[in-house]
A protein has these predicted regions:
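Short His-centered aromatic/hydrophobic patch
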Residues: 1
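Active-site core segments that coordinate phosphate-bearing ligands/cofactors
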Residues: 4-179, 186-244
Length: 244
């Protein structure tokens, strides 16, 4: 009946759309190191969504709905333990949307250089700026020793995002391997802080076209592979244990 009404061939495939974070999950599975292995994808944008792909035989963790954890379902109907917080919105609420982004590539050396001053001064944003969301939904965000320098301010917010992401990853019992994708994968203070906070985890980013559009394309052709490789992220030079 639908074919008759539309004039489409009876053999045409109709594909339903999927959420961008779910498309990111499909894109990540294009890498051999991720597909079929215990791994977590941290998709970063307005929302930071951590999605764990449990290894074979792994028992799913008990998740806390009150701390913004849930079981998502991937494109193939499989359960995906997940946790989320509004990391991008929180960062932008402090530093602005366009003028002082934390992921501007030419600014990365200066942002990394600002980290020691942030740690030494005790500058820290406490959660939560987007109240009602994330692992600390009832807390009210505020500064400790608010920095005046804009590089230090931006570096502080990257450390804040890494700290909250670290807690969210613990809540879904993330382990072994973590691929950070999306806009904030280019924020070196953020990804390197994650590598520092999770020394037992292989923290990765991709130098390939592996965004959500590629993930949606893999829904049509699951055999597609990314045109690049994964990069292992090195920890920060500074010790974050006291800061944490």
């Amino acid at each position: 009946e639908l074919a008759a009404q539309t004039g489409l061939c009876r053999t045409v495939k109709v594909l339903a759309g999927l959420h961008d974070s779910n498309a990111a999950l499909l894109a990540a599975r294009g890498f051999d190191a991720i597909a079929g292995n215990e791994a977590t994808i941290l998709s970063t944008g307005t929302w930071f969504v951590a999605m764990r792909l449990p290894g074979a035989g792994t028992v799913a963790p008990v998740l806390s709905e009150a701390r913004d954890c849930l079981i998502n379902v991937d494109a193939y109907g499989q359960p995906v333990p997940s946790a989320r917080f509004m990391g991008g919105r929180e960062i932008e609420s402090v530093i602005g949307i366009d003028t002082r982004r934390v992921d501007i590539i030419p600014d990365q050396p200066a942002l990394l250089a600002a980290v020691p001053a942030v740690i030494n001064s005790g500058a820290m944003m406490l959660p939560t700026l987007a109240q009602g969301c994330g692992p600390f939904p009832m807390r009210e965000g505020h500064w400790l020793n608010e920095p005046g320098d804009w590089f230090e301010r931006r570096a502080s917010m990257c450390l804040y995002a890494a700290m909250v992401a670290d807690v969210s990853l613990d809540l879904i019992e993330s382990q072994s391997r973590l691929l950070v994708e999306g806009r904030f994968a280019e924020a070196e203070v953020f990804v390197r802080a994650l590598a520092s906070l999770r020394p037992e985890t292989e923290v990765l980013t991709a130098n390939a076209h592996n965004d959500v559009s590629f993930g949606a394309l893999r829904l049509i052709d699951p055999a597609l592979k990314p045109n690049g490789d994964l990069r292992r992220v090195q920890p920060l030079d500074q010790d974050l244990s006291a800061f944490r």
